[in-house]
Amino acid sequence: MPELKVSAIKEGTVIDHIPAGKGLKVIEILGLSKLSNGGSVLLAMNVPSKKLGRKDIVKVEGKFLSEEEVNKIALVAPTATVNIIRNYKVVEKFKVEVPEVIEGILKCGNPNCITNYEYVTTKFYVISKNPLKVRCHYCERTMEEEEILANL
């Protein structure tokens, strides 16, 4: 397999094993195009992968992800792995996992849901992880992957 030539980062996060074509969505939902710390963001798309065939990789310099951000990644790229980098070394590595309950990340697709016109934190229960399907706590609307991605 040909070698992938991408420079290492000193401090930050590498999001690996993103399904091919989903890297831009990961950058978008994490707001990485608006980094205020001056760190760089690198997106490698459609690179060879033994596990996935093809994958995307996102490297973020100078940023460490919160639990909420990791949960957002799980909704878009459930196969992703997050690597925490300090002094050019991986100090922590974990797979993202879709939580059983999703709070405050997702908007409900039902225009009549109370969360769309009152100041109420959204809450969804995961019905299925593959394919991804969630149900709103308030109006009980069920949303599938395409609608979930549109409402992140």
Swiss-Prot record:
It comes from the Archaea. The keyword Zinc applies. The keyword Metal-binding applies. GO terms for molecular function: metal ion binding. InterPro entries: Asp_carbamoyltransf_reg_N, Asp_carbamoylTrfase_reg, Asp_carbamoyltrfase_reg_C, Asp_carbatrfase_reg_C_sf, Asp_carbatrfase_reg_N_sf. GO terms for biological process: 'de novo' pyrimidine nucleobase biosynthetic process; pyrimidine nucleotide biosynthetic process. Pfam families: PyrI, PyrI_C. Its cofactor is Zn(2+). Binds 1 zinc ion per subunit. Keywords: Metal-binding, Pyrimidine biosynthesis, Zinc. SUPFAM superfamilies: Aspartate carbamoyltransferase, Regulatory-chain, C-terminal domain, Aspartate carbamoyltransferase, Regulatory-chain, N-terminal domain. GO terms for cellular component: aspartate carbamoyltransferase complex. Zn(2+) binds at residues 108, 113, 136, 139. Belongs to the PyrI family. HAMAP family: Asp_carb_tr_reg (MF_00002). Involved in allosteric regulation of aspartate carbamoyltransferase. Contains catalytic and regulatory chains. This is Aspartate carbamoyltransferase regulatory chain.
